[in-house]
Amino acid sequence: MQKTLILAEKPSQLREYVKALGGFTQKGDYYESDRYIASSALGHLIELAEDTAYRPAGKWDKSYLPLVPPLNSYVYEPKRNDEGRQAHLKKLAQLFNNPNIAMIYVATDSDREGELIFRYIYHYFNCKLPYKRIWLSALDYSEIRQAFAAPKYKQGDPFLENLSKSAYARAITDWLIGANATQAATLQLGGDKLLSIGRVQTAILKIVCDRYLKNKAHKKTYTYKLITSHSYNGVAYTTESPIYESKAQAEQLLSSLATAHSFVSFQRKTERKNPPLLHTLDSLTIVANKLYKYTAAEVLASAQRLYEGKLTSYPRTEDAYITEEGYNKLKGFLPNLVNQCLNIANFTFPASLPASVNGAKITGSHDALVPTGQTNGIEKLSQQDQRIYTLILHRCLESFSEAAIYEKGVYEFENQGTSFKTHTSNLVQEGWKKYSPKVKVATADEDDSEEDTNFILQLPYKQGDKVTVEKKNLKEIESKPPAIYTPASLTEDLCNLSKFLQEQSPEVYAELQSEFNLKGLTVGTDGTRPNIIEQLVTIRKYIAFEKNKYIPTELGLQFYNAIKDIEVVNVAQTARLEYQLKQVAEGRISVTDYYNRLTDYVKSTVAQIFSLQSAITASTRKGLGTCPACKKGQIVEYEKSYGCSDYKNGCKYSIWKEIAHKKLTAKNIEDLLQKGKTSLIKGFKSKTGSDFEAYLVLDKDLKPAFQFNSKKK
């Protein structure tokens, strides 16, 4: 009997499929049942080959730049420096070539990256088997069973083809810009330093540096307004004049005030503040940083764990809406869930559909971030994961509640020709605000919302009534510099490129808006931005993260100043690339047309970099020890490995950052190189998934090898 091969993206996902579908027996790295053989990809098993596949062997050199392979000549190869993944790929090849397999069910993550992982493997194996696409928004067992009973997409579906093309276009864009611009910058400006340029990371670096420099260059200016104090029936209140640029004018007006105001009018209006939409990953990041100072990477990690624990839906979503079907499902369990988790009883849903329930507005691959209704494991969550989970619950309650309604009032007075006003605000219907998270961590660049402060004042004055001025003074208002970015404010700008450009660069915004619609464009994606920002801090060392603020380092500022005027750093060019990638995803332009534009841009970028003169002198990476291979360079930390600093002269020695599912620290590598042996490292995982501990030493081929504790019984 022929069977269907299930391909998951990672082992944890695979185990959930196996449990949900039932009837499986484990056979080494895969599972088998009467209908299925199931395995996982261990994430990315195949990747685009390094630049050495297209250029002469040896060290980097300007002579072969720009390096632009023909579109159809890109080489795919097994994941580099990862023997575990390479060995797994060989086992997976046996399953793909198994004559008993008649169909593949693609069950990698239901997003662009998950599609790319499968397509790379499928083409690398030159596989001809038909396939269907499993599409999941959550890992609860009922949804898994439904998805496998009726796969959402068949091979060749236009949505899948556009998704695949978009993923491939992004991959070759990042490869082409990264390989060319990084080598050009390193050769032209770096001296002995690697200077990394990337489509998204360099745009983020520019945005952070621009804001920091504006903050530091800010020169204080002052404006002025008159404040008068009054009381009625024991209730004190103040009135304020308009703002004046001239202190002398304000002082003259203050001195000329009469002893009493004349009452002019009272204007009342009702204001509605509608509930927020459901959480996307970006909105969750913004709230979590404002409340708990978590970074985007920390929020993503928590959201991913909650998803893998079947507690919430798929985290990498850009949509804040759900379908009516999804809403009805939530109505079935949300009141009991929030009673259990938040101690909120008797929650009731509104009579009409909330604004966040609108399937027609779902433009991406996934609905908004919501709970699944599962409760197993909630009590075991870490504090961070628990906080993120409760934020998702709170947002559901907020989104499914009535509007908050305020009664606003303005009392206006006049004194010697100067207008004075006092404002009142009364929250008459709490609505969704009743369910807002109560925890608040204040940040220096946040102002309290005026509408959330109740000030009820009832004055019985009639027009012309005199109101005694009990006290008067001049208030000096100091101008504020643009606030240095926090994870919240940076995410807000990166996920709304249109608003960012409109506020920060109106001329650029107008120019771009005349070319195309900026709505919906972002810098990078919600799934990639957190890790790119983290790399700028921990790997590139271009940005420091201090006291919840992103501050460029000396190296970051030097690099920014050297390249700030070239096209690859221009946020307008980032917007153009994002728009073109969006067109590919929507099937409006072909990958070929896009690639032709991209290669012209890359060639221009390399030429611009080679015209630069400023050398980068700031220190970048700490040497952890002498390279054991060439004996010349230092082993330093890179994005995915610890490698030789003398790479430009051909030394390719490196130690992969993750061995047996355990990330190695810089201290581990330092001990290995300088002492010949690490301290005892716990948390390695065997191929069967068992935990073990060991020392690391270098074998005769200079590769890390396990040395087990002989004293352990």
Predicted regions, residues:
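Amphipathic alpha-helical transducer elements in NTP-driven molecular machines
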Residues: 11-18, 35-38, 42, 82-93, ...
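Conserved short loop/turn motifs at secondary-structure junctions
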Residues: 2-5, 107-110, 191-194, 268-276, ...
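Metal- or metallocofactor-binding catalytic centers and their adjacent structured scaffolds
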Residues: 246-279, 285
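Intrinsically disordered, low-complexity regulatory segments
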Residues: 1-171, 175, 481
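Basic, low-complexity terminal or inter-domain segments flanking catalytic cores
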Residues: 2-5, 24, 80, 93-96, ...
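Active-site phosphate-binding and catalytic loops of NTP-dependent enzymes
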Residues: 25-29, 155-161, 183-187, 213-218, ...
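C-terminal or mid-to-C-terminal helical accessory/interaction module adjacent to the motor/catalytic core
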Residues: 99, 143-230, 268-269
